[in-house]
Amino acid sequence: MAFLPMNIKEVKARGWDEVDFVYVMGDSYVDHPSFGAAIITRVLEDCGYKVAVLSQPDWKNDADFLQFGKPRLGFFVTAGNIDSMVAHYTVAKRKRSDDAYTAGGKNGKRPDRAVTVYSNIIRRLYPDSVIIIGGLEASLRRFAHYDYWKNTVMPSVLFDSKADIISYGMGELQTIEMAKRLSEGYPVEALYDIRGICYAVKTSDYVPKTVVELPSYERVCESKKDYAIAARKELEEADAVRGKTLIQRHGNFILIQNPPMQPLDTKQLDYVYSLPYERWYPQCYEKLGGVPGIQEVLFSITHNRGCFGACNFCSLAFHQGRAVRSKQSVIDEAKSFLNDKRFKGYISDVGGPTANFRLPSCEKQKKAGLCKSRKCLAPTPCPNMQVSHTEYLDILRELRKLDGIKKVFIRSGIRFDYLMEDQSDEFFEELVKYHISGQLRVAPEHCSAAVLDRMGKPHIETYKKFCDKFYKLTGRMSKDQYIVPYLMSSHPGSTLKDAVELALFCKRENIHPKQVQDFYPTPGTISTCMFYTGIDPYTMKEVYVPKTEEEKSMQRALLQYFIPENKQKVIKALIKAGRKDLIGYDSKCLVQPMSNQNNYKGNNKGQKSSYNSNKNNSRNKNGKQTKDKFAKYRRKKK
């Protein structure tokens, strides 16, 4: 094994006179299958192509882009693992100081809108080269889209970047096919029938076909209703089984999106994860302190891709297909860890976007794709959904048996609503007994039914039942474990009254969020469509959207009502929401009046501020109940 060449010296050391492809990326180079760039470059290498990696080139100087010369076949360009604007800015649009995907962890090594900047430089320097853009930034900006940072609707990134093609989604199969045709001497136009790509033609050259036409760029700029219609159609056709070709007019050009590429089957996915990854970063990064993003995933295993949960704020349904690896492939990867002297016996995760999905959502999905008219899990599970953890459980059991494996953890998100639909408790029991490292992260996100409906999430009753069962099992097994709930403020549909309801829920359930995630409007999601338009694209009804910094800060403060610094904002929010009854000295109140500010100790005196105080208030080491946060449910059952 060896890292791919990162500079002309390393290219010459391999005896190459030229490279076939230059892969330009906005992250530091990490050769690990949790990083998309590693997968695509290793797939190209395995197909016999000479690939050079140009990692975080200096965009203010042409030298980095010139060092390899013009590649024989073309350039692949990606911003990296995440959108460069999300990497650079907080939801409050403040510049971040750190960057998990950059050596040394410092921000500033890639430009804003990295795909566009890199691609334009390449087009200027190599006017006739083929440029293919991909990854999350390009994929989620493939249509006209709302840009939160400019607060405007922008055209498809294909036009701003001057690239030839967008490879959207996970990318392996279309990359292999595009590379094959280019190597056979075909022009870029000969790639236009490949699934999983977008390209553009002049309106005068367009040959009418059977397609779904979206409202044009000009129309979605002028009409929020048209924007919502476009967003719904984009998602409806983002299915590899039933998705149709989409077109969207941009001035004198037409953007054409071919149907999604079929997801990798199990054999293909096994192949991708069997490639000779170094599972580390090159030596040149050591002096900078390494790449922080590798630490969390170094000894993790991805056993699946995609998610049929389809939360409205998540891009997975729009970006990933759905596929699973074979048990043997997962076992083989775990065995490879045993030969690594850095491995201490702990597998940090066996998961994916959602850890506990292995099956298609239903039999219909295989032949007809996912339904347009309803979600599989929300607001209630579809009666046709097939629920089983048998395959996943079998994999976990085999991993636990391996000599040299001390612990196998699950740190990816568990879909608790799917878990609660399983008629067998076998997986739940083994999850609690073997696979939690003290904390189990799950994502109820909110408690208000109205907000959860806008999110595409199950109602809070399911979460309560899940917690009740979790703590019963935890107590029975004498485990000191607790749940870490992810909660979100200011999602479209969330009023101040909803935020107050969430604060009261946290108080009742003894939840103390250490951090609060404000809704972040990123390109390509239904929730972002709601944020921009104030319209739910599924119902075309108006949606309340908290947009002012004042209200968003009040919603955040309500979730952390127990922090003294938030007291003034909490009081202001409660007054504005018509809930003065929650300001006072009664145990039901969230805060005390401002007149006693100097004496204010909060409602959680003596407790650590943690994600969830269940750590201190669930059960003691003997498994006996201490402060039982679910006592009210148990009393009802007596």
Feature map (PLM): residue ranges:
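N-terminal [4Fe-4S]-dependent radical SAM core
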Residues: 1-18, 28, 225-300
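Glycine-rich beta-alpha loop elements in corrinoid/cobalamin-binding modules
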Residues: 10, 36, 55-250, 257-258
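N-terminal pre-triad scaffold of radical SAM enzymes
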Residues: 24-29, 288-312, 338, 346-348
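Terminal amphipathic helices with adjacent charged low-complexity linkers/tails
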Residues: 60, 189-238, 252, 261, ...
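Conserved, mostly hydrophobic/aromatic
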Residues: 164, 272, 307, 330, ...
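Conserved SAM/AdoMet-binding glycine-rich loop
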Residues: 23, 58-59, 336-484, 488-492
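Flexible, glycine-rich loop/tail regions that form catalytic "lids" or insertion modules at the edges
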Residues: 13, 21-25, 66-67, 194-197, ...
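Flexible glycine/acidic-rich beta-alpha junction loops that bind and position SAM and/or redox cofactors
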Residues: 83-92, 140-142, 172-177, 202-205, ...
